[in-house]
């Protein structure tokens, strides 16, 4: 059987060939710029011996965690690569060129491994650069606010450029090689990146919030000592957690959103290319992404304080608006001069408008300057209960506004492509997602800015830097909390748009004429899909609670039993808490992932493709609502606490402050563990559904499909999937699987 590869270059115009080469060159340029910034950051001084010692401990803890995580998931990745190969084999019958099934399977499995490796690289390098940048920001703050701001932002830009460069490079190379067969391979690429992001988000979220909750409850509430006080045994684990959760986790999360939106746009674009004969449906999204890389590089140099002490948020917004302007200008030029259709321009511009709207909404509900956070701060005067109630109200309200904004963007796509087939409307939704994540470089720079400044502030506290440096770092840290909240909102919105576009690809690929909720199988599957985000959130939040319990006991024990720790004459055993966090995160890692991978397979084989579509709709709807609620409620509680720590209602140590700390402690696992992890959950379930669907159908004459139905084999698949899910959930709820082991060691130590 003949093999047909690189067919795209044969049918492309001269401009399109040069454009594809140009996209690859710009992707590589983004990677080279990341290398240039890395050298620039590493040349900056690290400060005193004590600062270097603390930074070294943070790096050691972070690298130990990620190394152990990669070892934990290695076998599962290998097994899934085999599974992905066979899904490609089954899908190979739909090859546009009649390529052999083994080639499609090999391409999809190779794409899966490439996506997984790229996602892991983005997370690993991004985290390591954050851990290199934190001590340098702390040192720079001793002399210059402007310099500290610049180092912190450019440290995050390194991760942004890696995300842009690797995501664009991977998608473009797959398209160039496979062309019309690219959708079959791109699904593997997207699945690999999304799966690693899920692991990073779940594991990193459990680690960071278990450490944070343990450190805050014993340190701030019980002992009344400041955050990052070196006497607290959980303080190093807390600082490590900022990196593994907010750097490695968010970097992998945004990377997989970047991957999945481009995968969805190219899959739908290829369908339109086949029907219209125009390559612009595929080339345009790639050109837009390339323009985003260029805009992010240029805008980096506008993020600097125009005067010493200027609000850092103004400088960051300046860079964001410049990148947005350059991006929209490029959309106009590509839509007008290349595609000759301004609907491309309008659809991608809606994505930029959505990103800006999400920025504003998140800022409104989580900023210390806005009414919602001020109301929560006021409620702390009457205790923890009213603090919790007030935060819940803010979170619920923000969810409504976010879903309205996302719905408006989909409505805008429908209006832009009105009068056309539904595939054009969904392609417009995919372009909206492409436009929203055009500013990926800026988004990740903003996100990494938060943990870098938080770590720098912690290093300054522990090493006893002068008040001027502490004030500078406290100001940068406050801005970093807002930027982290903003990027969480963007990640959630991008997850929904990507999921909707993938849903459309599923709808088109398997020729579903309707998805009828009156059908009992579809409705039941819709209900089950809606319950999955709640079960997933329960697993992750309970994991944080279990780990935090043992961290709290360990910190209390060291205060009570290790002579000199409370007096500050002896360092606590930081490594013990780091070890507890690492062990907890790894032991709780696989159950949420198995739930995401196996639940759509079970539903699809049991009830069929239409019911699977209903299941996906339930996951997308409830997952988005729950993610926004948790992210914004948690962010609002966090910043309400910070306003009180700045002196409001009695300041640190007051009853209002203790109530605020309780609110923040409840909100932490919501905004940094369960909420963010729902983004990759939504996309993993969508991608598994599209990938595994090829095994749920049999191709018939004329190019159609019929479902396999219930056979002994399919019933066996369903039973095995359900047994693994139930068994893993049951094991995860048994405390002896993690807790008793640690407790026994603690008792022996006594």
List each model region and its residues.
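Hydrophobic packing and interface segments
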Residues: 2-750
């Amino acid at each position: 059987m003949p093999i047909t590869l690189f067919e795209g270059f044969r049918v492309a115009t001269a401009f399109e060939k040069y454009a594809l080469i140009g996209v690859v060159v710009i992707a590589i340029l983004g990677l080279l710029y990341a290398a240039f910034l890395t050298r620039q950051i590493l040349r900056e001084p690290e400060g005193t011996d004590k600062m270097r010692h603390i930074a070294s401990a943070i790096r050691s803890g972070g690298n130990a965690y990620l190394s152990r995580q990669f070892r934990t998931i290695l076998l599962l990745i290998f097994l899934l690569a085999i599974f992905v190969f066979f899904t490609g084999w089954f899908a190979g019958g739909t090859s546009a060129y009649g390529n052999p099934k083994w080639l499609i399977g090999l391409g999809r499995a190779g794409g899966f491994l490439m996506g997984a490796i790229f996602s892991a690289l983005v997370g690993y390098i991004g985290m390591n650069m954050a851990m290199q940048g934190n001590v340098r920001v702390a040192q720079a703050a001793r002399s210059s606010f402007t310099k500290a701001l610049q180092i912190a932002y450019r440290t995050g830009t390194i991760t942004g450029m890696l995300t842009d460069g690797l995501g664009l490079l991977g998608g473009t190379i797959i398209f160039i090689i496979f062309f019309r067969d690219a959708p079959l391979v791109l699904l593997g690429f997207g699945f690999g990146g999304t799966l690693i992001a899920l692991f990073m988000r779940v594991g990193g979220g459990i680690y960071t919030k278990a450490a944070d909750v343990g450190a805050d409850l014993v340190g701030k509430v019980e002992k009344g000592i400041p955050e990052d006080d070196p006497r607290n045994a959980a303080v190093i684990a807390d600082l490590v957690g900022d990196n593994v959760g907010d750097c490695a986790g968010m970097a992998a999360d945004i990377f997989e959103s970047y991957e999945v939106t481009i995968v969805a746009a190219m899959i739908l674009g290829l369908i339109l290319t086949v029907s219209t004969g125009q390559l612009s449906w595929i080339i345009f999204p790639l050109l837009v992404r390339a323009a985003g890389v260029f805009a992010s590089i240029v805008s980096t140099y506008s993020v600097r304080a125009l005067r010493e002490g200027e609000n850092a948020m103004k400088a960051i917004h300046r860079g964001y608006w410049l990148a947005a302007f350059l991006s929209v200008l490029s959309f106009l030029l590509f839509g007008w001069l290349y595609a000759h259709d301004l609907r491309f321009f309008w659809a991608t511009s809606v994505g930029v408008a959505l990103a800006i709207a999400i920025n504003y909404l998140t800022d409104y509900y989580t900023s210390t300057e806005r009414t919602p956070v001020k109301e929560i701060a006021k409620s702390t005067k009457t205790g923890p209960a009213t603090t919790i109630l007030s935060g819940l109200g803010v979170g619920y309200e923000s969810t409504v506004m976010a879903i309205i904004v996302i719905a408006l963007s989909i409505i805008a796509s429908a209006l832009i492509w009105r009068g056309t087939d539904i595939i054009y409307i969904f392609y417009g939704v995919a372009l909206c997602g492409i436009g929203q994540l055009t500013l990926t470089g800026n988004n990740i720079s903003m996100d990494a800015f938060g943990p870098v400044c938080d770590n720098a502030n912690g290093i300054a506290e522990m090493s006893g830097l002068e008040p001027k440096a502490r004030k500078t770092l406290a100001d940068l840290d406050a801005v970093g909390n807002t930027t982290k909240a903003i990027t969480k909102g963007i990640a959630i919105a991008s997850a929904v748009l990507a999921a909707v576009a993938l849903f459309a690809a599923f709808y088109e690929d398997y020729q579903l004429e309707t998805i009828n909720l009156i059908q009992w199988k579809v409705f039941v599957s819709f209900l089950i899909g809606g319950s999955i985000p709640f079960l997933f959130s329960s697993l992750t939040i309970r994991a944080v609670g279990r780990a935090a319990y043992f961290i709290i006991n360990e910190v209390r024990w060291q205060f009570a039993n290790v002579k000199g720790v409370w007096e500050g004459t002896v360092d606590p055993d930081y490594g013990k808490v780091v070890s507890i966090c690492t062990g907890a995160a790894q032991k709780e890692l696989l159950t949420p992932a198995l739930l995401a991978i196996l639940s759509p397979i079970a539903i699809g084989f049991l009830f069929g493709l239409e019911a699977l579509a209903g299941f996906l709709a339930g996951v997308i709807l409830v997952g988005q609502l729950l993610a926004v609620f948790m992210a914004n409620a948690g962010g609002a509680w966090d910043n309400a606490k910070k306003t009180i720590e700045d002196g409001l209602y009695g300041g640190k140590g007051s009853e209002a402050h203790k109530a605020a700390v309780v609110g923040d402690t409840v909100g932490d696992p919501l905004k940094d563990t369960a909420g963010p992890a729902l983004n990759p959950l939504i996309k993993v379930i969508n991608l598994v559904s599209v990938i595994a669907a090829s095994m749920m159908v049999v191709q018939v004459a004329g190019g159609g499909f019929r479902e396999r139905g219930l056979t002994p084999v399919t019933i066996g698949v369903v039973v095995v999937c359900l047994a693994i899910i139930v068994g893993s959930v049951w094991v995860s709820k048994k405390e002896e699987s993690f807790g008793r082991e640690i407790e026994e060691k603690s008792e022996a130590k006594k």
